[in-house]
Amino acid sequence: MVLAAAPAAAVVTATTVSVQGTAATTCQVTLNAKVTPTPVGGTVQFRDGTVAIGAAAAVKADGTASVNHTFSTTGAHVISAKFNGAAGFDASTSANLTVNVGMGLNLGSICLPIG
């Protein structure tokens, strides 16, 4: 009889989400996620409520993933980031982050909140 070692348990991960930039219509922001501990590979899907924001972003060597996004409507947007897991790493979802989006005026090199 040959005995094999039990497979190692997957590492539990935690994901956080943040927004960089002016949250205003027509103004591009960067949605950032951080997965800890840093997985080898995997993707993060950002969501606005239940709606996926673009394609899933690859997790970089430092455990971060990001996507650029322009909000098309004003009001409260509930943003989350889900790490989809990777070999040896469990999936995890961030806490919700409420982003209040106002009206914006995109002047190309600068974006101004208005109203």
Identify the role of each PLM range.
Residues 1-115:
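Solvent-exposed beta-strand/loop surfaces, strongest in extracytoplasmic domains of secreted
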